[in-house]
Amino acid sequence: MVAVTGGRPPGLQDAPGAPPPAPAAEAVPSRPLARDATYGGRVYGGVGGGGCCLEFLDCVLRAMGVATPAEIMPPADFRWAARPMRRRRRGGSSSSSSSPRDREPRDGRIAANGASAAASLYTMRGNKGVNQDAMLVWENFCSKEDTIFCGVFDGHGPYGHLVSKRVRDLLPIKLSANLGRDGHKETSTNIVTSSMTEGGGTERMDRDTETPLGTEENGDYPEMFAALRTSLLRAFYVMDRDLKFHKTIDSVFSGTTAVTVIKQGHDLLIGNLGDSRAVLGTRDEYDQFFAVQLTVDLKPTIPSEAARIRERSGRIFSLPDEPDVARVWLPKYNMPGLAMARAFGDFCLKDYGLISMPDVSYHRITEKDEFVVLATDGVWDVLSNSEVVSIVSQAKSEASAARFVVESAQRAWRTRFPTSKIDDCAVVCLFLNTDARNKPPGSGIKDLANAIELGGGNLS
């Protein structure tokens, strides 16, 4: 039990004319990533953990006699336009909140509950509102029969559901834009290290994002891995720029995570942004399943991430009722409270240490590797890596594996946190079948790297 007192975190100040703080609240149980965090009677929306308090910033600025910037506080009619009306279907709402367009396969793409020959995917809405999770499986990616793109995206903020779906639909297209196309001018890698000249955030190459090349972990294919890593960095950069200048999606206080996997032959290329996660299910010498985490949860608790944020004047502290959840805040205002150190969107924090540069890694598939599970934090907050691998290994069929994980996570939420709201869950299970192992090691990475050299790198 954690007692919530009437004290304030370091740096917390009232706006001029603000009412006195409410008395101390009763002790509440600790819970992971609550969507709304209450402090001293005031509600600060935790982006990445929940909605953001635009009204609070408006009150602070008006009390100080400062005009509200249009780029930070868009007019009401613009915000309404960013959330299009959707007609409810009779007979109840779908748990996955997927539209007919999501359910219709397009060029090997599946973006709703279902399964393909190589993967299964499933999402279920929690009880916090609209489902902000999105997912995608794209077979024959880049027109290659043995190549698959998978991704899960966890939106947050008032328009997180729009941001996550935008990234789901556009990011793989940006990634494939420079594969297998002639006549495109090579884009310099400076695109991911240059500053955005029109405000709203700066992208810089950081030491913690540099992955050592030519090691056993990377499969001893430094040249091929470097080419693919550069391509992935470009795609993430251009995707974030698309969100920044999008005319109908307000991403100032909204954003999304992204964890993606490209599989070809023996090769897996993983790109991660935020706190969604990819876990490998493999077998040990006794043929027993165990879990290998392929990504790192990029949260403000990581020393290198925290150092970057503080260097750029961002603040990091936890709310009293969530002492284990570090959040990122603006230098002078206690908002938005982002529970991750990297994300698409969230442009209010892009000048203060938040970046959209993914952590990129490579894994060579072995004969012991069976599947990869990509999931949002609605799953990982209540199930361990080992539990998820065990659940998938015991599923009745590969087609039902993702649904089995989501339903298990929902039950775990009700059992472990009965007073908390259930988070949205999205899962993609990618099965590493024997057909993918017939190619010699490294052949997939080499094929994709050759395609990059032929196609150039124009992603804009």
UniProtKB/Swiss-Prot annotation:
Mn(2+) 1 binds at D154, G155. Its EC number is 3.1.3.16. Keywords: Hydrolase, Magnesium, Manganese, Metal-binding, Protein phosphatase. It catalyses: O-phospho-L-seryl-[protein] + H2O = L-seryl-[protein] + phosphate; O-phospho-L-threonyl-[protein] + H2O = L-threonyl-[protein] + phosphate. Mn(2+) 2 binds at D154, D377, D423. InterPro entries: PP2C, PPM-type-like_dom_sf, PPM-type_phosphatase-like_dom. GO terms for biological process: regulation of intracellular signal transduction. Residues 1-30, 83-111, 192-219 are annotated as: Disordered. It comes from the Eukaryota. Residues 118-432 form the PPM-type phosphatase domain. It is an enzyme of class 3 (hydrolase). GO terms for molecular function: metal ion binding; protein serine/threonine phosphatase activity. It holds the Pfam family PP2C. Belongs to the PP2C family. This is Probable protein phosphatase 2C 38. It comes from Oryza sativa subsp. japonica (Rice).
